[in-house]
């Protein structure tokens, strides 16, 4: 069953005669529970595509459907709520709140919604990621790999429809990168969690269930 679909997605910048096509007719489908890597060189359009998938930017034409919701039909306010509730993000630079503890960072999106967190589920995530003894720590007391584990836990905590990971190993050494990718694979399987990961690294991409290659704003392989 597909959880994510794009249809003829286009994104242009600028005006004639200097229009730049960042995305040009991108159509992809991702099934529930799939771990997909989108790979491309710098300037290929992969980051622009991630922004479209996550509702962080709107396409010039075409549409994105997540969990049967067409993002283009949501106004800005509803899109913000949908993004918070149904899409988890993992960024290269972790994006943790420095004044909040590890635990507070993990439950932060749920707290923003005024909802009660599923503590049993979250503790299962915490144990899987090896964060049990770090819950009271502030982010600046953690290594880069530990901070990325917190970011993964935060993305999983709200049980999103999809998780979007933007170069999640970009700031990590090779050993820690391997550990983070392995954790993404394990969490995808254990929680049947859909993950779409952006990367420029072929070795990292090949560890996903499937690889989609983007070149010059178009899908070259999927």
What are these regions (language model features)?
Residues 216-222:
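Conserved switch/coupling elements of ABC/ABC-like ATPase nucleotide-binding domains
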Residues 3-214:
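ABC family nucleotide-binding domain
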């Amino acid at each position: 069953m597909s959880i994510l679909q794009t249809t003829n997605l286009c994104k242009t910048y600028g005006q004639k005669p200097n229009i730049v096509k960042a995305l040009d007719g991108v159509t992809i489908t991702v099934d529930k529970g799939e771990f997909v890597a989108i790979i491309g060189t710098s300037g290929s359009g992969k980051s622009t595509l991630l922004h479209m998938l996550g509702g962080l930017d709107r396409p010039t034409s075409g549409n994105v459907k997540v969990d049967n919701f067409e993002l283009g039909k949501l106004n800005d306010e509803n899109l913000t709520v949908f993004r918070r509730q149904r899409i988890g993000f993992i960024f290269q630079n972790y994006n943790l709140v420095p004044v909040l503890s590890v635990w507070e960072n993990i439950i932060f999106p749920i707290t923003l919604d005024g909802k009660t967190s599923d503590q049993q589920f979250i503790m299962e995530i915490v144990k899987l990621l090896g964060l049990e003894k770090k819950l009271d720590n502030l982010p600046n007391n953690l290594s880069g790999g530990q901070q990325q584990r917190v970011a993964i836990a935060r993305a999983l905590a709200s049980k999103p429809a999809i998780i979007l990971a933007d170069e999640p190993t970009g700031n990590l050494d090779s050993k820690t990168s391997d550990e983070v990718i392995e954790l993404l694979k394990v969490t995808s399987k254990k929680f049947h969690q859909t993950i779409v990961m952006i990367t420029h690294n072929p070795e990292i991409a090949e560890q996903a269930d499937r690889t989609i290659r983007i070149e010059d704003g178009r899908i070259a392989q999927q």
